[in-house]
């Protein structure tokens, strides 16, 4: 999956390079003196040659100085007034370690900070309402991120492959977590999903290898395909009564998962949902009516322990057998 994403972004990169760039914003030169931050980092001087703006001065098209390490955009006359950070604007700025975004900015573009491998700190102001696709993907030194409460959705791949990210704050303004939003954040240990979230899209937390537990709020109605696949440290999961469907391979290869409780609200479980959960000991079904499952060739519990127990309510055994659940694993309780 990650290889496909990298191939995809590589193709887009080549297309981007081949396209003609927008016009520079030619105004009188701006300048500022070196400043020392609270963390004793020296902010780099800003020259008009360091960046390219759109003709109206509202969009940062490209940051052009590869040697910049600490950047406070508020200290430049024109950067402090921009509204948009454009697609690819800081792409592959490997030396950039810290950036302060002005509170005039409302949108951070697609791939804007992708592969800024030295970026450890970023201030996202409350003016920002959109963090677009793959905006911070592959920022491998970023350890934490505070998403402002002005943001309503975390879009596709926004923080994917941020390998050093250990925690993140998701505000109650967020209603949806997009596809691959935190995929392959291999050091992410826990995350709090607020009750405002109604949608968690496919692969959102796929390959978060150190994620141990997650609480899904009762506002969520479905768990998309491969959302928690390959989360090998995940030991517990709370599925609320609001959830109606569990997508394909949603918990595939979650090798540390031992017990799952399935609320009566769940009406369908797609193929391979819990396949290769090699330590899964029991699944407790609360409903008298079994969730619909696919045929045995794509069985929900493929490659799970032979002594897996499917615990169901008393009197419901025949219904579960007719629905395709294996009789030898069913225990009425």
Give the ranges of each region predicted by the language model:
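Sec-dependent bacterial lipoprotein signal peptides
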Residues: 1-18
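Bacterial Sec-dependent N-terminal signal peptides
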Residues: 16-49
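Structural signature of tandem-repeat unit edges
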Residues: 48-57, 66-84, 94-107, 117-130, ...
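Short linear proline/tyrosine/threonine-rich motifs used for host-factor recruitment
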Residues: 60-62
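Consensus positions within tandem repeat domains that build extended binding/scaffold surfaces
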Residues: 86-89, 109-112, 132-137, 155-160, ...
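Short, aromatic/basic amphipathic alpha-helical patches
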Residues: 297-301, 316-329
């Amino acid at each position: 999956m990650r290889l496909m994403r990298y191939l995809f972004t590589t193709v887009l990169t080549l297309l981007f390079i081949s396209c003609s760039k927008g016009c520079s914003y030619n105004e009188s030169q701006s300048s500022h003196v070196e400043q020392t931050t609270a963390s004793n980092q020296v902010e780099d001087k800003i020259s008009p040659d360091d960046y390219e703006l759109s003709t109206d001065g509202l969009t940062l098209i490209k940051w052009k100085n590869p040697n910049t390490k600490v950047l406070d955009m508020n200290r430049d006359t024109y950067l402090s007034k921009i509204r948009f950070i454009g697609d690819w604007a800081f792409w592959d700025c490997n030396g950039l370690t810290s950036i302060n975004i002005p509170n005039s900015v409302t949108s951070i573009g697609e791939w804007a900070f992708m592969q800024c491998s030295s970026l450890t700190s970023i201030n996202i102001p409350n003016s920002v309402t959109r963090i677009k696709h793959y905006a911070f993907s592959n920022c491998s030194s970023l350890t934490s991120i505070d998403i402002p409460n002005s943001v309503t959705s975390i879009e596709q791949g926004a923080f994917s492959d941020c390998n050093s990210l250990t925690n993140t704050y998701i505000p109650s303004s967020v209603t949806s977590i997009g596809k691959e939003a935190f995929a392959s954040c291999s050091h992410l240990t826990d995350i709090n999903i607020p009750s405002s979230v109604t949608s968690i899209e496919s692969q959102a937390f796929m390959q978060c290898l150190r994620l141990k537990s997650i609480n899904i709020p009762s506002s969520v109605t479905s768990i998309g395909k491969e959302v928690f696949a390959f989360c090998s440290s995940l030991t517990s999961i709370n599925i609320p009564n609001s959830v109606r469907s569990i997508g394909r391979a949603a918990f595939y290869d979650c090798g540390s998962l031992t017990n799952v409780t399935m609320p009566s609200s769940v009406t369908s479980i797609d193929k391979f949902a819990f396949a290769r959960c090699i330590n899964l000991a029991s699944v407790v079904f609360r409903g008298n009516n079994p969730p619909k499952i696919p045929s045995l060739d794509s069985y929900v519990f493929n490659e799970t322990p032979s002594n897996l127990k499917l615990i169901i309510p008393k009197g419901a055994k025949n219904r579960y057998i007719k629905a395709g659940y294996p009789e030898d694993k069913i225990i009425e309780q």
